[in-house]
């Protein structure tokens, strides 16, 4: 975690992502150590409550996914089709451009992303929930058949959402986890055999990625091929930054330079936990790899653990149907209530940030989903307390599929999922860690792990203060623009000011401010420049000083931010000014506009040598200046970069743009 802290001092992007990684891995170690340090009965009860909370939290997520697929997605597509030109223009994407085609392709796919934002990451959670809830339903089926039915229903819905999302990796991981769970429950293998099988499954995923890279384009499959590209680039990044890596948020920019020549994608993650950790933290990332591997192995070990003892007089075969010996114990009577209250409170608190945007019907459904999640939490706790082979195999299979999918997807990289995923894996591992009577080190380790969590907590509190101040500025910048959106939806009257004025106000708030690293993040600066480009595209401008101010702000952004997103957005400002200049705009010279465009494009290609748009801009500027040799050279680079995207045809240039580049390349 040392590299995370070091990189965090340099950039808030490294800080907020890295702190979540640190918290997730530190909490995993603390959970396992603390559960091992507890007396057996208390540890068992605590595990049950933790599992109940972690799994039941999936219910509101699954509910949201169902709404997205069958209600929100059709409405979103209809809205896009009705306002397609305006939406594309607001993003600066010409009709038929690679960006527009890629955006439309993703928009038309019905996906249950819930609050994760990524369908493949959400599919990891749904798949794990499907398998774990199925094991819990089997464990509870004879004691509480009604509760078992509800658990089975949630398992079925979760599995259906995985199918709807169409995530091949999640489906294969779910299949592997199910096979492993069924085999463990049916054959009752030894613990060593379970660990070997689980390890083999995870290693096979890594081997599949490497073999797919070796096969190359001789096979039409693309998903694993792209994963092999990510791993190849990650290896190059580790070689160049072996000690402390490039930081939790540094992979994206590094990938632009290190990616293979035929890789058409620009990604922020290696889509493999081990590669992400090594690229982000260098050799220090091996500590997390070892910890994660140990947790997965322990969870597999737990699949072979002896089932919980049944009630007196109940045979071992019926253990899943029996009530624990202390049916009136605190764990059995109070554990479900504790888990239900925690889940209910968390689900209701999660509504607060969205409260103002929810109508009455949606709000009622959110509350009902929270109540249903609370009931699922209580049922899950009782299933875990009953235990048995089915439950032990189910949770071990869920951990295995998470570990497998984490080697080909961003499940263990994405901040919204890493904490939940690692916590479930840690609790699954804790089932295989009974405490011996002479164990004196577990309490010490638990205390040390808990104290270590104070480091990310302290840094997080300090960073949250500046983040809160930056959030207030962003909210002020967005407020005038939101008024126009509400007016378009006929929810509020149209504002008295113009849209261009609102965009300029937002740009000034985001680009001119006192020192705050959270407002100087590339994503915020890029958005500010995009709003600036839209504001100055209006002729005549509302303020004669706007064009000159736009040149100044764009150049300042290029001075302080060496990121492709910022360079591309600065180029949009120059192009907007150039188009406005043709229509008679006054205030800046053509030479100043061309200078900004050339500088932004040069910055763009220096960061991303395969930026088609950057090379095309350089070709256009050189042609306008009468430098045919430079124009031809840049056009040839643009055409070569465009050819390298053959694996993703939608990213290739439209025919008319490519024809223009070919003309420029031939003019020497």
For the regions a language model picked out, list residue spans one by one.
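Flexible interhelical linker loops that connect adjacent transmembrane helices
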Residues: 433-445
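TM-adjacent membrane-interface loops and short helices in multi-pass inner/ER membrane proteins
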Residues: 73-77, 118, 228-268, 274-288
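Alpha-helical transmembrane segments of multi-pass inner-membrane proteins
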Residues: 1-8, 15-214, 273-310, 317-319, ...
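Intrinsically disordered, low-complexity Ser/Thr- and acidic-rich flexible linkers and loops
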Residues: 312, 356-359, 582-588
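Juxtamembrane loop-helix boundary motifs flanking transmembrane segments in multi-pass membrane proteins
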Residues: 104-108, 226, 230, 247, ...
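Hydrophobic alpha-helical transmembrane segments in integral membrane proteins
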Residues: 69-70, 211-225, 453-482
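C-terminal luminal/periplasmic domains and tails of membrane-associated envelope-modifying transferases
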Residues: 475-668
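Short extracytoplasmic/periplasmic juxtamembrane "stem" segments immediately C-terminal to an N-terminal membrane anchor
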Residues: 84-88, 225-236, 472-488
């Amino acid at each position: 975690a040392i590299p995370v802290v070091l990189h965090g001092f340099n950039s808030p992007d490294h800080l907020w992502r890295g702190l979540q990684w640190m918290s997730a891995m530190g909490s995993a170690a603390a959970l396992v150590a603390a559960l091992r340090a507890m007396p057996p009965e208390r540890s068992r009860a605590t595990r049950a409550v933790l599992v109940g909370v972690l799994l039941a939290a999936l219910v509101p997520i699954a509910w949201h996914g169902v709404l997205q697929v069958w209600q929100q997605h059709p409405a979103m597509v209809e809205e896009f089709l009705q306002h397609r030109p305006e939406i594309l223009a607001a993003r600066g994407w010409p009709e038929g451009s690679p960006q527009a085609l890629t955006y439309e392709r993703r928009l038309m796919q019905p996906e249950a992303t819930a609050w994760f934002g990524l369908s493949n990451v959400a599919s990891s959670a749904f798949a794990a929930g499907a398998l774990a809830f199925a094991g819990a339903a089997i464990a509870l089926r004879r004691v509480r058949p009604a509760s078992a039915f509800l658990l089975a229903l949630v398992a079925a819905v979760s599995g259906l959402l995985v199918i709807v999302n169409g995530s091949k990796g999640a489906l294969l991981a779910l299949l592997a986890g199910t096979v492993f769970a069924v085999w463990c429950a049916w054959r009752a293998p030894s613990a060593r055999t379970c660990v070997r099988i689980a390890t083999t499954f995870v290693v096979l995923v890594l081997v599949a990625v490497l073999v797919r890279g070796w096969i190359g384009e001789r096979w039409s499959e693309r998903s694993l091929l792209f994963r092999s590209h990510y791993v190849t680039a990650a290896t190059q990044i580790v070689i160049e930054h072996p000690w402390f890596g490039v930081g939790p948020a540094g992979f994206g920019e590094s990938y632009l330079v290190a990616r293979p020549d035929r890789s058409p994608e620009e990604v922020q993650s290696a889509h493999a936990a081990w590669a992400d950790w090594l690229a982000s933290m260098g050799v220090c990332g091996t500590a997390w790899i070892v910890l994660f591997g140990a947790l997965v192995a322990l969870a597999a070990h737990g699949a072979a653990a002896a089932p919980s003892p049944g009630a007196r007089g109940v045979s071992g075969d019926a253990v899943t149907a029996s009530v624990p010996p202390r049916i009136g114990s605190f764990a059995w009577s109070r554990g479900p209530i504790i888990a239900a209250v925690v889940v209910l409170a968390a689900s209701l608190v999660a509504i607060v940030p969205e409260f103002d945007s929810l109508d009455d019907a949606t709000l009622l459904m959110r509350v009902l989903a929270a109540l249903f999640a609370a009931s699922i939490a209580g049922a899950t706790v009782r299933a875990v307390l009953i235990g048995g082979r089915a439950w032990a195999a189910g949770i071990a299979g869920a951990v295995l599929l998470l570990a497998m999918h984490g080697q080909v997807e961003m499940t263990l990289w994405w901040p919204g999922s890493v904490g939940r995923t690692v916590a479930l894996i840690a609790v699954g591992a804790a089932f295989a860690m009974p405490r011996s009577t002479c164990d004196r080190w577990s309490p010490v380790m638990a205390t040390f792990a808990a104290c270590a969590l104070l480091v990310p907590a302290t840094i997080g509190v300090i960073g949250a203060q500046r983040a809160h101040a930056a959030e207030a500025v962003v909210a002020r910048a967005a407020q005038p623009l939101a008024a126009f959106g509400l007016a378009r939806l006929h929810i509020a009257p149209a504002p008295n000011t113009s849209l261009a004025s609102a965009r300029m106000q937002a740009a000034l708030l985001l680009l001119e401010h006192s020192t705050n690293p959270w407002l100087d993040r590339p994503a915020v600066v890029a958005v500010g420049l995009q709003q600036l480009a839209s504001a100055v595209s209006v002729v005549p401008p509302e303020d004669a000083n706007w064009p000159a101010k736009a040149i100044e702000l764009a150049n300042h952004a290029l001075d302080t931010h060496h990121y492709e997103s910022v360079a591309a957005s600065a180029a949009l400002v120059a192009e907007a000014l150039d188009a406005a200049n043709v229509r008679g705009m006054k205030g800046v010279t053509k030479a100043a506009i061309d200078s900004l465009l050339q500088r932004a494009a040069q910055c763009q290609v220096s960061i991303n040598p395969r930026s088609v748009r950057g090379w095309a801009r350089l070709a256009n500027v050189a042609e306008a200046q009468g430098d045919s040799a430079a124009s031809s050279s840049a056009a040839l680079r643009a055409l070569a970069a465009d050819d390298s995207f053959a694996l993703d045809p939608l990213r290739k240039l439209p025919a008319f743009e490519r024809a223009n580049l070919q003309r420029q390349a031939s003019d020497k």
